[in-house]
From Swiss-Prot:
Name listed for the protein in its UniProt record: RIO-type serine/threonine-protein kinase Rio2
Cofactor: Mg(2+); Mn(2+)
Catalytic activity entry: L-seryl-[protein] + ATP = O-phospho-L-seryl-[protein] + ADP + H(+); L-threonyl-[protein] + ATP = O-phospho-L-threonyl-[protein] + ADP + H(+)
One GO term (biological process): maturation of SSU-rRNA
UniProt source species: Archaeoglobus fulgidus (strain ATCC 49558 / DSM 4304 / JCM 9628 / NBRC 100126 / VC-16)
Amino acid sequence: MNIAELYGKMGKHSWRIMDAIFKNLWDYEYVPLQLISSHARIGEEKARNILKYLSDLRVVQNRQKDYEGSTFTFIGLSLYSLHRLVRSGKVDAIGKLMGEGKESAVFNCYSEKFGECVVKFHKVGHTSFKKVKEKRDYGDLHFSVLAIRSARNEFRALQKLQGLAVPKVYAWEGNAVLMELIDAKELYRVRVENPDEVLDMILEEVAKFYHRGIVHGDLSQYNVLVSEEGIWIIDFPQSVEVGEEGWREILERDVRNIITYFSRTYRTEKDINSAIDRILQE
């Protein structure tokens, strides 16, 4: 998606309509037109026309069944979250798409306050959020709320881990997390010359995370970055706090995954149980 081009097509009334949708996502799967009109302080007919325009741009999805209502698409939620970052003075220019997967889309951007950085737009929520049973008058919890909670989860985890081998995190709005741009490559893309040392560095960070009360939750070769300067661990939407239900099993899985990768790729010999015990005892 060309989010910069799309951003330029939004006017003040479009943002007011999107404000109204955002504020009511927690109460409605599709926010009723009457409520959007009221919150945006725009007449219903004009609001309907703006929503049609936004739908044509794939920013919102409208429906007529049962009642007339609208909700965000992933692009729309990301666009609106970017707008909140711009409005708060955190982002001044958005760049190109750097990468996109099932869980997020990452763009480079520029901030006068923070310099060159990246903004990560979350697509889906934390696994546990998918089991939310909240019911509302107009349907179930919308995926947008799950994406927002996923972004919030990552932001809060990174805040607790600042100063360790993680990106500096600057802001969170909607489904967007603004963070430091790290010039490094994913572990699976490179051939490291000192695998035992790199593995030890990763496990040391896992131990530091644990002592700050955080378990990554999805540690693998895909979210470890390496360069000549060291290693960084990224992607924390599935992180859990130490003490949450199942945290120990999640920690053990993280350790097992990364040790198994090094064993298969570099024939390293690291005992998984001993590594886990060391993390818990340090």
